[in-house]
């Protein structure tokens, strides 16, 4: 068993949060039921609610509570149910408080430095974890948490440059291929967490993500000192994934040559499929938002090239023309549908064979 805060995992596998609506209670609960950590994305979790357009905040909080409870019911006491909360979102603090009240087991936070996270999670019963892309980021966050809140991380997630969605790397490094590898970042982060393990008297497990695809990858990184791994894209082609079958089919039909690095309205680079929307952005076209859900802290509707909320909602519905389909670098390896249990069993078997 791998202890993370007050809870434990029987399998050292985290499912990465995917918004909008890709990882909700169905997927997260199924992963947790297998002994891993399932993760619900807080990003517009209420996009299907009837009042979402009129009152997105209320819709999102109501849906987030329902999805956490759904996941916990499916898990039936196994594994852990987490949320992924993006620092860049307008509703960041409120969504975390909602999740804590709903009984979530852990809060994982990235898309910016989650410097204030311990102050938003007012109980030690809920584990907290930053997502980092360098030892420097881990050092900055852990130092701030210890000094300002007298608390440290219960675990840390390293997201490497091959991850899908928003990326914590400079665009020029992503385009040139000069980003640090996970093999290089992992020892840096392990060195940074060590003093805080001593100070707070407990281990701080480190998980790696971004390009992780097989149980052999899990074995490789655990040999290097990681506690486990996080996968996201591989979980999209599970039957339990909360996205539409149309969304899953788009990824199943994609090849590695279809992947692009984009600049997101969030203000960060991201990895996504080269869909008609992405092609239009590359041509300098603009699609002014028809309605603003006030999802991002930094978004200016008068200037933004497109509405990321609209694009991600259209994607999760399977709309290839208007959707933004985030994906990891290994999306071209997806070739079939499977259950979460089948995927988890495959990963664990490969891990045991290779460790």
Report residues per predicted region.
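Residue-level detector of alpha-helix initiation sites
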Residues: 22, 212-213
């Amino acid at each position: 068993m791998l202890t993370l805060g007050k809870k434990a995992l029987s399998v050292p596998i985290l499912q990465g949060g995917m918004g909008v609506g890709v990882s909700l209670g169905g997927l997260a609960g199924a992963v947790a039921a297998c002994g891993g950590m399932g993760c619900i994305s807080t990003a517009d979790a209420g996009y299907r609610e009837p009042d979402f357009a009129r009152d997105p905040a209320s819709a999102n909080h109501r849906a987030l509570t329902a999805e956490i409870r759904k996941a916990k019911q499916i898990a039936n006491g196994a594994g852990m149910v987490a949320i992924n909360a993006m620092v860049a979102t307008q509703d960041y603090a409120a969504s975390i408080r909602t999740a804590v009240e709903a009984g979530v087991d852990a809060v994982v936070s990235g898309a910016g430095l989650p410097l204030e996270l311990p102050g938003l999670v007012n109980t030690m019963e809920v584990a907290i974890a930053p997502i980092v892309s360098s030892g420097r980021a881990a050092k900055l966050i852990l130092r701030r948490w210890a000094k300002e809140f007298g608390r440290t991380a219960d675990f840390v997630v390293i997201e490497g440059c091959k991850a899908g969605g928003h990326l914590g790397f400079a665009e020029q490094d992503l385009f040139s291929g000069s980003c640090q590898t996970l093999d290089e970042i992992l020892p840096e982060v392990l060195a940074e967490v060590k003093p805080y393990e001593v100070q707070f008297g407990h281990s701080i497990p480190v998980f790696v993500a971004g390009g992780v695809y097989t149980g052999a990858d899990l074995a490789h990184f655990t040999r290097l000192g990681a506690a486990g791994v996080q996968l996201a894209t591989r979980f999209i082609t599970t039957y339990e994934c909360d996205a539409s079958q149309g969304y899953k089919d788009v990824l199943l039909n994609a090849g590695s040559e279809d992947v692009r690095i984009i600049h997101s309205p969030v203000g960060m680079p991201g990895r996504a499929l080269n869909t008609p929307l992405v092609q239009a952005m590359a041509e300098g076209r603009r699609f002014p938002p028809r309605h603003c859900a006030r999802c991002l802290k930094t978004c200016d509707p008068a200037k933004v090239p497109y509405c990321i909320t609209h694009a991600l909602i259209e994607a999760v519905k399977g709309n290839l023309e208007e959707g933004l389909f985030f994906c990891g670098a290994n999306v071209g390896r997806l070739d079939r549908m499977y259950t979460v249990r089948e995927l988890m069993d495959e990963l664990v078997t490969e891990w045991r064979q290779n460790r």
